[in-house]
């Protein structure tokens, strides 16, 4: 199936979306009684602090050998499929790893509510990154009036529905790219004014925006507060305690942004 199936792979991120092989692989694991081994590994990891996922990496290498996987893209598909199966099972056995209790969720929600009703001017957002008419508007209103920022907000809102880090980091990374494009469009429009409609969107996106880490981090934080995942604090704690699994630099970058934001 891995050889014959057509699949999508983002090589630079070592990511492949859920597909036919994922469906086949979970059946393969159950058929070969592989879930018992997964359960044993999960319970070992759960009782460790911080969570060391080296045993998951060893399991992945075992399946690479069993299935004789040598092609890089096939290895990526296998890693993503096993990660989804493994972390879904982890959540079934130990839902407390990412389930938020009401008191933590309530306090975090209040903080987010305060921030999303703040204005860019009130929290010292760099005026070069925003249209002048946005500076005195509550940030929640800015997001609702911008299709681009709504897209980023939706990517982040979806995080609470995932149990595995690869999909969490991919959606976070997608939101970061949207924020970057928003800033590029805003700074480009400031330079060309009403002539913005004369330029192709791809040209605007290719523009190099002069944006510091602090600038993009603050914008990302504010977008996150509009519709934050209900299990944000638990999610952050779990991701912070993970070790033993490697991700490509862009996804490690996304992890850093997400955990730091929460």
Where are these regions (language model features)?
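Alpha-helical bundle/repeat cores within regulatory domains of eukaryotic proteins
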Residues: 154, 166-262
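Intrinsically disordered, low-complexity regulatory segments in eukaryotic proteins
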Residues: 1-206
